[in-house]
Amino acid sequence: MARLVGVDLPRDKRMEIALTYIYGIGRTRSNEILAATGIDKNMRTKDLTDDQVTVLRDYIEGNLKVEGDLRREVQADIRRKIEIGCYQGLRHRRGLPVRGQRTKTNARTRKGPKRTIAGKKKAR
């Protein structure tokens, strides 16, 4: 099993898909990495040589911000928005959708489960 930037890549998946298991790498970025390193995107992870793994590791560590570094940067950006008190920061602080989605209905993922209000009756 190939290990890149602290993530074990699945053995039986194609490289194009396996690289997406790393936080910060999607399909497009995965294809860019494979093209830059000269590795076939249809090759399986288990078929990689040690040299190819080394080339991939060096490319990713040298050119991209992934995994822990990227997570820390995103958290720092959110913290900064909360501290300066901008609209997005207020939405983060209140646990509401940040990017303008409706909240009268839906938004349950961000708001959490419904809380029933005592004494509220349905009007007929």
Curated annotation (Swiss-Prot):
GO terms for molecular function: rRNA binding; structural constituent of ribosome; tRNA binding. GO terms for biological process: translation. It holds the Pfam family Ribosomal_S13. Gene3D superfamilies: 1.10.8.50, 30s ribosomal protein s13, domain 2 (4.10.910.10). It comes from the Bacteria. Located at the top of the head of the 30S subunit, it contacts several helices of the 16S rRNA. In the 70S ribosome it contacts the 23S rRNA (bridge B1a) and protein L5 of the 50S subunit (bridge B1b), connecting the 2 subunits; these bridges are implicated in subunit movement. Contacts the tRNAs in the A and P-sites. Belongs to the universal ribosomal protein uS13 family. Part of the 30S ribosomal subunit. Forms a loose heterodimer with protein S19. Forms two bridges to the 50S subunit in the 70S ribosome. This is Small ribosomal subunit protein uS13. It comes from Mycolicibacterium smegmatis (strain ATCC 700084 / mc(2)155) (Mycobacterium smegmatis). The lineage of its organism: Bacteria, Bacillati, Actinomycetota, Actinomycetes, Mycobacteriales.
